[in-house]
Amino acid sequence: MDADDSHMDSDDSHTQPDETGAEPPAQAAKPASATVRARRARVAGGRRGAPAPRPRPSPAPVDAATEQPKKSRAGRNLPAAIAVAVALAGLIIATLFLYRPSFAIVVGLAVAYGSYELAKAFATADRHLSLAPIAVGGVAMIAAAWERGTNGLAVALLLTVVAVLVWRVADGAHHFSADAGASVFVVLYLPALAAFAVLLAHPSDGAARVIAFIATVACSDTGGYATGVLFGRHPMAPIVSKAKTWEGFAGSVLFCSVAGVLFLTLTFHEAWWKGVLFGLGIVVTATLGDLGESMIKRDLEIKDMGNLLPGHGGIMDRLDSLLPCAAVAYLLLTAFAPVA
């Protein structure tokens, strides 16, 4: 019973007849409170059907100048990525066939800028690299590999590591282990591995060797990307990279095996099974390189190493699989197709 009704009953119970014995006229019902009126309105509305919803305002028009470029299902700006890849491929082919020493120059520039990207990335985690000796020593390692081969590379690598440690000593003992360890890691990861691409290019058939190496790595990326987007269902390493799937890896294996057989049989005139092994070695190394780069970026809590290359990120985002594959390609091609 509502409070208004109980109050009304209380008034009626205390009403006494007048002197003539007649009952007094009944009091007029008090107006319903706002709460009661709202409740009655809801009940009535429920009986008659819910009122029509209010029209939603139309979204504001998107300015074509500020609209973001559409991305592919894999999260990349595919047209920009293809354009950059074609431009880089044209640059590499030009250096290999017009003036091969210029290929070493391009690799040296990539090492110097990649060192800068890595220094910025590691700085976000309060790990400060010895950038100057890494960049200068890295370029020296590329030059030594071109001029003196593996022996020159080994000497330049040793001197660069010593220079990195001495440079860091000048900054004091605070975080020395973390900074020095990160700096030595970068020396081994970037210029030391990039130097193997220069070693591939140095022989008389170096252009063919570099193209076989880069094209097979590209087949790994393309095969994994295409099959992963179309058929990818089972993540390979979800903790490290959600984009890697076993279906994509199978596509990489297929594409790399075919590319390896074609290059080893048609270009180097070797047995087909050597091409299969070459392709398998490249695809496994490229996949591990991608995952390793993803681990580094997760550790540093960054998405990309930079933004120099539209659709790819930074230089290091493009070199993630090429760097370790350069060393593997050099070893396998030296074993399977020795220089005459």
Annotate each PLM feature.
Residues 331-340:
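Juxtamembrane boundary at the C-terminal end of a transmembrane helix
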Residues 299-322:
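Interfacial loop-to-transmembrane junctions
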Residues 82, 118, 222, 291-294, ...:
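Generic detector of well-ordered alpha-helical packing
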Residues 217-229, 285-298:
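Short helical (or helix-break) motifs at transmembrane helix termini and adjacent helical loops
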